[in-house]
Amino acid sequence: MQKNWQINNKAKVILGAAYKNENYQSLYAGSSSTTKDYSRDNWGVYSQWEQAFNEKNTAIVSMRETWTTKADGDNNYNNFSAAGQFVHKLDDENNIYASVGQSFIMPTFAQMYGASDSAIPNPGLKPQTGINYEIGWKKITGKHSWKAAIFHTDIKDNITATWNSTNSEYQYKNEDFKNTGIELSCDINTDGPMSYNYGVTYQNPQSKSDTKGYWDRKFGRVQLTGGVTYKKNKLTSSLSGSYLAARVATPSSAESYDTKPYFLTTFNTIYSPDKKSDITLTIDNVLDRSDNVSHSSSSYYSTPINFLLSYTYKF
């Protein structure tokens, strides 16, 4: 439920509320003689105020209150988060901005209670909270849209899966996470049906768990992305790729070590014969590469080239 108001020609307000009921049932199986039923009600109220001070300066402030009720064992959460952004227009083509925002993510029931031959439940999993900072520049000139940004992220109790290679099992746990980096991207439109995009990010993601007690490298430092899209009449097709280099594998109880880059590619095409129908073909791993996409001490290789053909009808 959401309501938008145009207060005047310089101010806009958004107010909204959200509700969702979650339920998780662990049914009887050969490995378990009991059944379990978990549920909780998720509530949220939020607001946003956008204020244009003049032709060059605009500020946006948003707030959200999130809470749960009726959780098992009274394991309820309550969080207030806020965000703000200031945009300054340099000229008709250039803007600079600065933003800061808090984040809040609750653990899912699957992460807390999910159990299988390889998954270990963690009912004590805590929600993750964080704060994100970003300053940047945007430029729209002709058919090009440029963006450059410097960012920093701090997350407390980041929810992450940890793999135990000895027992061949994994469990979701909390660890602290931080990342600082710079990114540059460009979107290119043309007079014809083609459009293009590319981007590069240099970053330094790190994590600290109770097991290690020190900041250790994670994921990869260099990411290159790119894509091309063809759109004409009822057909839209796109080819995209993501290359992650300067990667590390990060074991749960040992120091990270270097691992090879990976290159992921996807082709997607949608044909819409009418307003209610879509025929979609998605092909993953177009180059049929065998890349280890895991960032833990175990190896998990990308699925060979595969496709999904689907039909969607909107009522």
Question: Which sequence ranges carry the predicted segments?
Answer:
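Transmembrane beta-strands of outer-membrane beta-barrel pores
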Residues: Y19-Q25, E65-T69, H88, V100-M106, ...
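Membrane-embedded beta-strand positions of outer-membrane beta-barrel proteins
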Residues: L15-A17, V61-M63, G84, A98-V100, ...
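Outer-envelope beta-barrel architecture signal
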Residues: N9-V13, E55-A59, F80, D92-I96, ...
